[in-house]
Amino acid sequence: MDVSNLPSLVTRLKSMVVAGLLLACAAGAQAAGCPALLDRSMPRLQDEKPQTLCQYSGKVVVVVNTASYCGFTSQYKGLEALYARYQDRGLVVLGFPSNDFGSQEPGSNQEIASFCTSTFGVKFPMFTKTRVSTSAGADVNPLYAELRKATGSAPRWNFHKYVIARDGTTVESYSALTAPDDNAFIERIEKLLAMP
């Protein structure tokens, strides 16, 4: 065995170990920056491609289950206005169509996407049709299962809202009766946006 190459071999091995450690630290830092509640991917409504919710870390997140044929469907307009008004300050609205209540979301993902954009000009992120009700059992969307666990409150109808604070752990629940333009709701959103 030629030992003259040993120092260069050791140097290369050290470089590879250091590079591996740096990559592992970077991956760990990324995962550490994402709260457990948002550490998941969901398929987008428009193309069904997975989208990580970690990208919303550090934002105030309004999660709402939606339906196209509900008495509360007009809340899309208020949700879009809320999103447009506060997105530059760190708010995002995430819509999750569901057919769980009154079968008021019977369409396909493409039909729902078309309805949302053509009827209400929805630009906030929307995800594929999902199950949000406690009656869904094991089929309930895992994000909704965690939101229910965090608040002790499950959606009882379409347009139930959860608000996740920037810390990713503080969660509040609002029934469908709370409109997106409700003064108390807006005040709470503004307080959460003002918090680090």
Label for each model-derived stretch:
Residues 57-61, 87-92, 120-125, 158, ...:
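Loop/turn elements at helix/coil->beta-strand transitions in domains of secreted/extracellular proteins
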Residues 72-140:
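Structural microenvironment flanking redox-active thiols in thiol-disulfide oxidoreductases
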Residues 52-54, 84-85, 150-155:
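Surface-exposed acidic, glycine-flexible loop patches that form ligand/cofactor-binding
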Residues 14-26:
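Bacterial N-terminal signal peptides
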Residues 30-54, 74:
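N-terminal "domain-start" segment that seeds a small globular fold
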Residues 142-196:
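Thiol-/selenol-based redox modules, centered on thioredoxin-like
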Residues 2-17:
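Bacterial N-terminal signal peptides that target proteins for export
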Residues 65-69:
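Amphipathic alpha-helical repeat scaffolds
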